[in-house]
Amino acid sequence: MKRRAKELGADLVGIASAETLNAFPPDPRWPQTPERISPYCKSVIVIAQRIPAGAFRCKSNTPVQYIDMLVLRKMDKVAYRLAEELEAAGHASLITASQETEWALKRASYGRLSTRHLGVEAGLGTLGLEVNILTPEFGPRVYLTGLVTELELEPDARITEQVCIGESCSRCLHSCPADAVLHFGIDKRACATEAQEFGFGSMLGMFDGLIDGKTDAATLFRSRDFFGFWQGLLRVVGSFGDCPRCLAVCPVGNDYHAHLAEVQKVIPEKTPEHVALGKQYKADRATHDAGEGPEIAGLNDWNRRWVGVEGYQGIVARQLQEFKRQQKERAEAEPE
């Protein structure tokens, strides 16, 4: 099944057990579980599609927005075709459209399934400091979706080593223009001001202004904001994924080593306050791991399974060494 998904175009594929996903919802208050979708689900096939690194070498964020749209379209097509093939073989299946959310789940701030947590349970990566999923191959520069199936498949093992370098890196924290990166958590409202420039909240703001009479309709309809809203409806461009900074600067993944290490080395947004906060997180982590100090919500007993129960053990350093070795071998193999 995983081989077939890759033949169809998936970059990464993993299998998660529906039973495990039902037992460990990311937020038990708002359970994002397969059983809420179908009581007959046995497995979830998790598909990840990489975002081409070239998008993070551009002068503005606009190319990332367009690439995101294309990546999502490709990924949904891969998952849909796989679901069709499963049904043709006698196994009822359906896909959960990537990035969809449900109003009943915390006013649509959650999807029916958390694709990040699906990826962790399917052995594709672990959550980072900013709670994006970090895959060893592509870091956080991926989108994921889930295919819910009644076929019982052997689940993949979770990665127990923390893929994220963590507090001693803090590059995502340093780069965030909204100061939204918490300690293995995210301030969603702050993040949305940059990541969802033309999202649902901005749309409500536009129409509130019209209803209250505070906004001139003719001016609004000829504004960049209204154009962004229209484009978001057509292509999801601007409605999410606007701000790629935490993705661009993360040093995890061979795509970073190959294409981004030089251009993303310097972080213009980095401030003394960012550095101080990263150091505070590091100190808090040390006391937390020693069983002292206040609890860190993102590292409590429930959430630790998705961060990596073993902590960071140097996976990025090992990966970089292997990348350099392969580069050297390729260079030596090339004819002069």
Which residues make up each language-model segment?
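Non-catalytic, usually N-terminal nucleic-acid engagement modules in DNA/RNA processing proteins
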Residues: 1-75
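FAD-binding beta-loop-beta segment adjacent to the flavin cofactor pocket
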Residues: 34, 280-281
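Catalytic cores of enzyme domains
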Residues: 65, 70-271
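Conserved SAM/AdoMet-binding glycine-rich loop
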Residues: 240, 274-276, 311
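Compact disulfide-stabilized, cysteine-rich extracellular microdomains and processed peptide cores
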Residues: 263-264, 268-275, 325-336
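Short, C-terminally biased terminal segments at protein or domain edges
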Residues: 268-277, 284-294, 298
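Long, compositionally biased charged/polar accessory segments in the mid-to-C-terminal portions
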Residues: 287-328
